[in-house]
Amino acid sequence: AQPVTIQSMINARNKTDNCKVDLFGVKNKFDKVKLPSPFKFTNDLERCCYDVIDSLPKKKSLPLIKDILSSLYRASSAEYFIYTNSDIGVLPDFYNFISEKIKSGFDSICINRRDMPKHISGQEIDVSNFEILFSELGKYHMGADCFVFHRDAFKKMIFGNVFVGVPPVGGVFLDQIRKTSNNFHWVNRKGDKQGPPERLLTFHIGSDRNWLKNENIYWTENNKQAKKNNHPFENHLK
């Protein structure tokens, strides 16, 4: 999914005509990852979840959300930041839409994705053909995984040691952008699960939820970390 995500962002950036968009990736210092231009890397992250939470096994190097955002904050002077999970693709008008919403007075935005099929008419969706997804309705997804916020708001956010990769990082992030903004807007918040989206802006290929399989110690620990900061993530859809 990541090649599709990357190319969709490049395509959307190239079709943006009402604002300047810089694309950044963030990686751990041990990761051997390359990104095509115009993507740039922030400084490498120096730690991950098991470096700060002793109970976690050293199997998954999941970064802390505050470290990711701090790295972006230092790398960019942009007035507004957009964070998406690494497997979330965007539509061609994505950045234009966000720019219009900001100009209309919103200072934070959450966009719920649509889950798209892995195959269409016998074709497996990949980086060469993913735009055929844009005529699909997809399926409703309740999770929060795309956020827009002002750079000054980040300085007020409290994440503790919550890390990415498993819930409830999305609920915690949503809680924080709502608390630190003056005019919040939520796209695709509600609706008939079988009906069309309010606006198709982001997508995910498939609906796999690997973090649900077996007993997930990372999910359990992330819940504990969120509760330490009194995040009401359990009620974040209300």
Question: For the regions a protein language model found, what residue spans apply to each?
Answer:
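C-terminal catalytic/acceptor-binding lobe
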Residues: A1-S8, A12, V33, G160-K238
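Short loop->beta transition adjacent to catalytic acidic/histidine clusters or analogous donor-positioning motifs
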Residues: Q7, N11-F24, E79
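Short, hydrophobic beta-strand segments that form beta-sheet elements in well-ordered domains
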Residues: K20-N28, D107-C110
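Active-site-proximal specificity loops/subdomain of glycosyltransferases
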Residues: L23-E79
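Short, solvent-exposed loop/turn segments at secondary-structure junctions
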Residues: N28-K32, R47-C48, D87-G89, R114-P117, ...
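Conserved catalytic core of nucleotide-sugar-dependent glycosyltransferases
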Residues: K58-S61, I68-L69, Y73, I88-D175
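Short beta-strand-to-loop acidic/aromatic patch adjacent to the donor-nucleotide binding site
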Residues: A78-V90
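Short, Asp-centered acidic motifs that coordinate Mg2+ and/or phosphate
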Residues: Y80, D107-S108, F184
